[in-house]
Amino acid sequence: MASQNVVFAIDVDYRPEGTQNTTNAYQDHLKQWILRVLLSLGHRYGLEKVRWGYKFFNSRTVKSATLITRGSDFKELQEKVFSDFEEELHVKFTTEGKSPRSQEKSHKLKPSPACCVQNALKEILLDFQWDRPDLTSPTKVTLRPRRSSRSGRNIPLQDCDMLSVDKNVLFVVSECPRSKAELEDYLSMRREDSRHHKDINEQMLPKGLIDMLMQRNVVLHWADSGVFKADHVAKDYTGIETLMERLGLVGGQVVPMLSPCLPLMDQHPKMNSLLALGVDAFPIDSTNSYLHLSKRMQQQLFPPLGASFSWIADGTKRSCNVTLEPVSYRQRSLRAPVDVLLKGVLQSLDILSLSHSAIETWILQCPDAELGQEAFQHLKQLSTGGHAMLAEVSEGDVVCSAVLSVLSSCTAQITVLQPLLAQEGQLLPADLVSLDTTDISGDLPDVVSSVLSVMYDIMEEDDCSDHEKMPLVPDWANQELKQQSSSRSNGMVEGWFPLSDQSGISCHLMESMRLLHAAPEEKEKGEEYSDTQQEITSSLSEFYQSSTAGSSGSLRSKKRGTQCTPVRQKMKTMSRSLQMLNFARLNVKAQKTQGDSGSAGSGKGTEKGGKKSSGDRTKPGLLHFSSEEELLSHLGLTYQKAVENRTMSVPSQVQDLLSVVKSFLKSNTEASLLNLVQKHVLKSCQSIRQHYGNSSDDESKIRECQLQAVLRLELCKQTEQEDEEVVEQRVEDVADMLRNISRSKDAVYLSRFMQEEVLPLYMNSIPKVLADVYHSLGTQLPEALVAVLPSDFFSDESLAKDSVSVSLSSFSATQSNISSVGDHLEELRNRSAKKRRQSMITRHKSMTEAPQALRQIEMPRKSTRLAKPKLCVPIEKTAVEQPPLPKQPVQEVTKVRRNLFNQVTVSPSKKSKMPRSQSVSAVEGIKKRKRSDVDNDDRHTLLTKKVSETPLHKQVSSRLLHRQRTGRKSGESDVCIIEESPIKPAADLRRSPRIKSLTRRHSSVFYSSSQPRSRNLDRVVSSSQLSHSEGKGKFSVSSVRSPVRLLFGATQSPGRLRHTTVSSLEDQASKGLPLRCSSFENQNKTPQKLRSDALASAVGCRTPQSPRTPNRTVGDNGMALRGSPFQSPAAKSIVVETPMKSPLKGILKTPIKKSLLDCVSPNGAWLRSPGCKTPKKCVTWSPSPRKPVPENQVNVPDSPVFAKRHSPRLVTPGKNSSPEEKIVFKTPDKVPQRKSKTSPEIILRRLEIPVNIDPETCKSITRSGKIRTLSLPYKTSKGSDEFLPQSESGSFPFCNSPLKPNIQKTIQSPIPTHRMCTRSGNTPVKESCSPSSNSQGITGTSPSPRKSLSSAVAKSSPSPSFGPSRSGVGNQNNSSISNVEKHTDDDKIIVQNKANDEKAEEASSSDSQQFDCSEFSITTDDESIDISEAAVVKTQLVGGIKMNIAFSRKPSKSDVFEFEGKQTTSTGTPLTRSYGFRQTPDRRQREAEARLGYSSGKPKISTPRTRRTPACGKQSSPQPLTYEVEMEMQASGLPKLKLRRTDSFNAGDLPSSATKGMTSHLVHRNKTNLKAPQIDSPLVQSSRHPGCISPSLCSRATPAKGTPGKGVQTYICQSITPTHHPTSSQSPLASPLTPSPQSRGWPTPENLNSWPRKKRARIETCGNKEQVIKGVPLLEKTGVIEDPELEGIFRIQGVEELKESLSTPISQRKLGLRSSQVMDHQGSPEGMDWTETMAQMCDAKDSTKTEQFAWMGRKVDTPKVKKQVSASGIFALTQSPLLYKKSAVIKEATQFSGSKSELEISPLCQPRRRRTPSRTYSRKKLLD
């Protein structure tokens, strides 16, 4: 509370005229008045809060040097300070012998008194520090809040006390000008031309001075020291009224200091000097009270009473209404009606006689101005000469005499005389002068006698035989007053008596009181009572004496009185925090010594036992309960009182409550204390919240929560033998109550409550319970509690000495398997009992937002002591696994900081069985999760085996984690594990091909789920295989989220992986959990892959119109769970009708029900369309984990794009991507890619196009996507590419642009951009932006595949869209969508072929993850559609893993795909066709290629039945393509693919955009690895096709760089880095390309540096950087990977993508790179650079495209960020699971309404800008 600052400005020039005695009396009274003011403030606010000061000034003379005040600052209220003041006051008044007034004439130039007063006030305001705390007193609190506005000053007295806490007070002690004449004298205005009234106000108190007072928050009062003369009656009160008006502006008043109540007669002989001044006439306390109280309070204390005043004038009786206000609030109120009758005038009245009588004084005022003026005029005439008047006051039937005196022109004072006066001989003098002389003599005695008679009657009625009236003040008070040197009047006594206890009673008085009670009276009730009274009196007397003698009244003396011990002395030197801790520790020790019994009683008994403890007091009542009902009612009342009574401590109330129950139970043993309390007293946290609801009574709620919490702790204390589960439940309840308190109040309040009330009582008795409560709250254990905890409470794992702030590690390692909570905790205690306690647990940051990078993983390790190493219990959901054999070896659960490159040296067989590591989020509660492999305590002896990567202080005890989880547990299910990270969906983590032992993945393309395979083969397959999601219709390999699996493929058998991951995914999917973009959810968490099954099935089942399906399909195919044991071929066959069934779903812990297609856009539905339905098995055999090809990849072109896969791109919505795009991205790429035939990329592209996924989004998706599907970007038919541009403009991401064609085109289309590897590892779905022309072969609907996406879109717009997009984008983009769909059919086929080719590519070169970007990795139905059969020809495990796989593509069904949207360009097949593509020979060929894992060329194979765009080019020959893939695991760990086309290939197909794009893509990516087929070979063409190249770009950085959990996963390498980027735009490679790790400040891993690097391809592009970034998905922030972990890393655009982006119009880019790619592929000869191809396609399709590309003609150097990477490295990256597929530019395919491509393409959606078609891409051959 702020200090009370009081300053007295004392005018030393004012001295009452008279003798020296008069002056001395004035000084004495002034000192007394000041002291009384200070004491009243001290009584009100505390003596230590009052600071005061004083200043002397001259108002009538020139300022004297002697008036310099010694102290100009505030002083404390101490005796010495006041003594100094007295001395100085005496000096000031005695320095000048004369009265100042006698010297007035000598000073002709003296200033006016007003100026002197104002100057003094200004000096005081400036000298004193009003707004600062007292620095000399540390106990004084803080600064006082200032009032900045004046408005508060205008009514300061209305609602608050005048001397409120935040005010400073300034008193001017001087004579107040009363009349107008005095006012003029005060202002020195003696001339007749006096200034205007306004000027008078300004001179009285200038505005500047008022402002100063307000700024300093000072209230100004004027203490009038003037004395009334007996014969002085002011004519007017202008002066005092003016002054009061001005003071009211600053909240001040004019108060009398010496003014008497009644005028005194100067001639009275008995007057002494004090009485002459009227000192006793007006009690000082009344003045103080008047200042302290507001007007409202004064009216309440002194209520006005209505009365009638009558007088006789000129023989007529006149009357008027008046009000009577009591002078003292203690006097009785008069009974109405009250009549005052003026009787006459009193002469020579001795006023002193009235002061000794019992009187009651009232102030009489007349509210009526006219009547009042007349009445008071009459009174003035009578009072001339200072005579008082006699009046009669009749109240009811009683008539009393009264003395009336006039105070002012409107105020009079009436003093009612008591009847006792006459009997005591104090009758009024007889010399009364009456107005009517005849009546005076006879009337007066009658009046007196009547009054006396009435009073006698009253006294008799009251049985008062004694006529003496009891004095108002007790005898002891009078005795005390007599001890004083001077006499006191009644007024003084009345004011002093009530405050005597504060002002202090002398020792003499206390001794007298003690003597009074020395002999107990017999009237007392008994001896005991008498003794008690004596003891109290004695104690009081001793206390007063000791306090008076021992202290001088100052606070400091009390401090000095405290005992100073060495401990206290030492603690004074400590910091405040240390002092608090030490006090707590000392209190704990004190409690230990006292024992628990001391807390039961509330107080100590006196020595004589007179005072009983609270327990004793309650016992008698407790024993009287006759029934339990009475007890319960009593408990209810007691409980309610405890809630309402907040003065008592909570523990004492709880103990009293329980003591009542205990005493009752002594006689009723059948009732149990616990049961009774549990049943009738305890309340749940929920019930309390419901009870108070929205009530504002937070205090009661908090109080009740405190009672409930302490009650449970008390129960734990009194019943320590309870079952541990019961105790745990109580702990949780207590934590809930405390959380309620924290929410209602704040954490500081809760901490204080725990420290002050809970810890001291229960710290010694139940420290473990308290520690558990703190753990559950997630707060730090107090040091005092840690000190008393048993040594075995903490485990070495959980604590480190001097542990720093808790990281997420304290929560992140959750117990995955617990046989039982009790057993587990007991085992932990027993295990750690032998270990030294190291330190306290710090606050867990999981309660806050701690970085996920600090997450720990629990990695089951084989027990080195136990024999059966083969039995390994994955920490994934145990429900999926079969319970281990009883004798199964126990696994050691070790907290391991995730390190992607940390391998445990275990034999390959063991590794294959090793379950993927599980990152558990401590936030999810797994309270009673049991280990399936642990049956008894012996099984889980968790010895502390630490992995070197995890420092001791980073490890957390399972016990603590369990406590924290149970405390935060909100879900009902016991098992709530989030596998990779709390947020990200399950998806395959990227694996590094360099770790061969971990590379094992099962390719769904090659094996059916039921088909067994050898372990070696599994291992080989895992290294190059796509995500399981692709492989299995119902299962997604993406379920495996371990970094190892993510990087290197599944290590477990497909069956197991499927069970574990699928079940979890299916569970989540079944729960309807929405798909999440893994990259978005948690930077550290690997995104989960969408189930490919769901997508594939959706794709297959749905007509192309339902674009949603593709979303899922894409995601499912694209993602394979990293550690999923099973990547069974069944996944391939995942043509799940229901997208939700995809196995990946089951695997995904995160809810990812919908296939990416669904999420992405309405187009997803058409992806699921029949085309998708028939999933062709994609040979996304590449090591990329994400690329598992769904078994059944739908050949139907319409669905394939989506079905192909939701590449990771989809998973992570691009930042720029539209909401729909984001939706697509959100779909975790990890969702197993549907077996849908469409390659994931195709799906992604489709998805992306409709969704307008930003390249960033795609990137992030790719990163997040765990499945590294190597699907090459499917080159969409040119038509579809065209569609893509439309979709770009359109809101529908997928449907509008032919995602499929783009996908088929491979990375050229924006899909590559999106393909950027997302964290999850899934290649983001690439928008089917690849040149429409390329895909057009597939989508025959688009008129000219060659045309840019925009043109293609425009053309395709005439054709009906596939179907309304879910988001409605489809409607917007219907035209484009329809084109897209038609193209998509073609695209799907192409994509499928492409996907197969891509997969083949991926398989052939697991080195490069180009296919991450490429559609191949997409395991969507489209991808798998084209592969009719695949066989492992040769396997070699010596000197590197080598496999020869022969696969052939089925012709894709172009006819199935139907476009709902109007495709302007589509002239071919009717829209009503089934969604599947026609099985044209070229389509079949492409399908075969897709199955084989490589694209046979541009996926031109079969155009969908929808009409092809004229520019589409030739359809691929019906002949299915057959390829032989040879995969070789190099020593560097990078797989190497060699594709060999074994079956006939239609050379004519090469030009087809899709085929060509696929081929060029494959060739570009894998050129070194691929053995280029004939020009007619689809692979060759596709390799030449620019779109094919982009995937390689996609694989720029190594994922190996960082652990998935940590911030950055770098892509292994950038396969192709164009030397030049579009000028303003980063080269497609530039933005999209992931900057080399070094650019971000991370050193490139050695293994990356050691990889062979491909020289940067020179890309001559012109264009602006912004466009590239925005327009090209990859370049766009697509280039930047969304995943926070990969922050700063840009996805590398595939060469194809670059070409596409450069050559493709912005709008096309927006749609997707793929469309551009497709067109380029068709247009360009096989050997032509992708840019050239693009240019040709653009020329053929649309001149506008070339124009659009023309602006990209300038050369731009590739940003230095990109590092050249060897060809093999690039290839490995693209193929490697480490790389995520670039997301197709899904969102780019927003609706393109016109044939024009819109420049306003969402960055994600836009394909990468390609340089002008004329530019050539200088591509170096990949090096082995």
Curated annotation (Swiss-Prot):
Biased composition (Basic residues): 1807-1824
One annotated GO molecular function: chromatin binding
Biased composition regions of type Polar residues, renumbered to the chain: 562-572, 907-921, 1005-1014, 1103-1114, 1319-1345, 1462-1472, 1617-1629, 1636-1650
Alphabetical list of InterPro entries matching this protein: Treslin, Treslin_M, Treslin_N, Treslin_STD
Record's compositionally biased regions (Low complexity): 546-555, 1347-1370
Stretches assigned to coiled coil: none
Biological process, per Gene Ontology: DNA repair; DNA replication; mitotic DNA replication checkpoint signaling; mitotic G2 DNA damage checkpoint signaling; regulation of DNA-templated DNA replication initiation; response to ionizing radiation
Pfam family, one: Treslin_N
Region of interest (Disordered), residue spans: 542-572, 590-622, 907-973, 1001-1035, 1098-1117, 1189-1221, 1293-1388, 1459-1518, 1617-1650, 1803-1824
Subcellular location: Nucleus
UniProt record similarity statement: Belongs to the treslin family.
Function: Regulator of DNA replication and S/M and G2/M checkpoints. Regulates the triggering of DNA replication initiation via its interaction with topbp1 by participating in cdk2-mediated loading of cdc45l onto replication origins. Required for the transition from pre-replication complex (pre-RC) to pre-initiation complex (pre-IC). Required to prevent mitotic entry after treatment with ionizing radiation.
Subunit comment: Interacts with topbp1 (via BRCT domains); interaction takes place in a cdk2-dependent manner. Component of the replisome complex.
Protein name as annotated: Treslin
Organism for this UniProt entry: Danio rerio
Taxon lineage: Eukaryota, Metazoa, Chordata, Craniata, Vertebrata
